Amino acid sequence: MREQFSVLVISLLFSSSYGQVGQMGPPPGQSGQPWTLAEFDAIDTHLKNIQMYARSLQDIVYQERMKQYPFMPNSTAGQPNMGYSTFANDVINRLTKIEFETGELVTQYPLCPSGGTGGNPYPVIPPNAPPPQNVMIQSETIGNSSSVIVSWDRPNVVGTDVRLDDLQYKVYFAPLDEYGQQTAEAIVFSICSVNQTVASITDLYPRSFYKVSVGTVICSTSESSSGAKSLKTPDIIPSEPTNLRVDGTKPNAIALRWDLPLLMGTLANYTIYVTSENGTGFEVAVDPTQVNAILYDLIEGTRYVISVSAFSDNGESPKSSSIEVMTDVFVPDMPRFFQVIFVNTTSVHLVWEPPNPGAGMIRYYSINYTDSLYSQFFNFKTPNAKITTAIITGLQPATTYYFRAFAHTGRRAGAGSAVIMQDTDITVPTVPRELYAQKAKNDPPRARLQWLPPAKTYGSLKNYSIHWGVKNGATRKEEIEPGLLEWYSDFLDDNTEHEFKLYAQNEKGYGPAATVTHRTPKRDTVVPPNVKVDRKKGKNNETVLVVSWNPITQPGKQVSGFRILYRKFEWVYTGRWSLKEIPDPNARSATIGVENSNYSFIVVVRGYRNPRPNMQVNPPWPGR
């Protein structure tokens, strides 16, 4: 501040002297003659005297200003009559000496004559120089003192023959109030040469308002100023809050209190730093008017390390000394009224009510469950404590399960509820396994089916049901005892693909079918001609079918006997064929006793030949 004030005084004296320069002749060095050593010594003497008087004047004015003009920091405001009686005389005396020395210096070397002839650099007074460009202001506060750095770009001097060495800059500075009104007269804070485009203003109040502008000067008679820029100096960075302490603890909360920082301006907020014993941390912002806070949503029975810092608009203070606090221990009670409200084959819907209120927070609930064989144990968790219902899925039908509910804090589980035993609903059996079909008899063709029971019967099986017939044709249905794992078909058509579908049934119903196909071989059959069937009454008044046929006359069609297949005629095919075998190749008729005399019957007669000794009628079961 002192150096800038001396520059201000010198600038003012230069300005008062330059008005007389136009009446003087050319300076040394501009009349065609080089300067002598004596001329250099004379100028040097004047400069030393100016500096000496300026420093003396600066000390006097600075001391007085500290008493009377306290808009700068580090000063003590006083009454206007606090100056000593000879202050004005001392200032005038030194100003007179400075003005004399300056006038002598300008007489020997005028910087910028106002006009004339005979080698003067400016035949006329130069026009106003343009103002500096891109004026920028930055402010910072360190400790309890603020500073402002002003920077600018050199103006574009175009269209005039101006020596840039004659260019100077003036930095103007004035205090403002918070509403932007100027509270004191602007002063020239710094005078800079043409190559100096940065100036600093120091020893300012933090969080104070100022106005700064920069002017361009040529020959001290021509000046253009930039637009004024307003700024607020940053606040001081506060010291750390003191005496951080605990007011109280609960399972999920800690009450804190602290004292104000010893060094502070206007605070923006406090920040509380919290780190738990497992290393996780979080921060809490607190209003600057408060010196206490309550930390919520903590984990019970957990140690926390806590510190606090203060913020101004200029940054954060150091953190306070940390303290270690442990929240209270809390174990919740058991959930109440735990019950099942819905069940189906694979899921159970459970509900409950929260435990009796305690001192701590419940975070979530869990359901532990297993089947009656304790083969596997499972756990279901609710997302939060607001949910007091659970739908347990993926269960097995017709199975007994045990369920138990627990309330959880952030650290531990409470007491378990009463255990609930619940059976899931029964469902139909799964598909019979490893269904296999093979030839059981070749003439007439029959199939033999074998299988294994379903993997899941869900109770006892009532029976099996097989649906079979020519593929994509009419089907027949038969029931099979639940203890049997084998079944023989009725006589089948030659050279035809048959389809068999096997279902298992429990008390719930039929499950899905296992399917297998079997194709009968193509055979060369012998059918006797002119087959006839008559219905008659026998000796005991029973109904008999008299079947007759003519002899087989085709060459090479010798038979060993005849087989007669017969069954009652039905629109819906339900019954099986009956077989009567006549081992006489010369037979021409046969009598068959039947029931249900009111039904019509279907009769098929075929000749057969006995197999040769090397023929296998029933090949062995594959893999057996």
Swiss-Prot record:
Tissue expression remark: Prismatic layer of shell (at protein level).
Gene Ontology cellular component annotations, sorted alphabetically: extracellular region
Stored PROSITE patterns: FN3 (PS50853)
Keywords, sorted A to Z: Repeat, Secreted, Signal
Signal peptide segment: 1-19
Localization (cell): Secreted
UniProt KW Metal-binding keyword: no
Taxonomic superkingdom: Eukaryota
Cited Pfam families: fn3
Domain Fibronectin type-III: 131-236, 240-330, 334-430, 431-524, 527-624
Protein name per Swiss-Prot or TrEMBL: Fibronectin type III domain-containing protein 2
Taxon lineage: Eukaryota, Metazoa, Spiralia, Lophotrochozoa, Mollusca
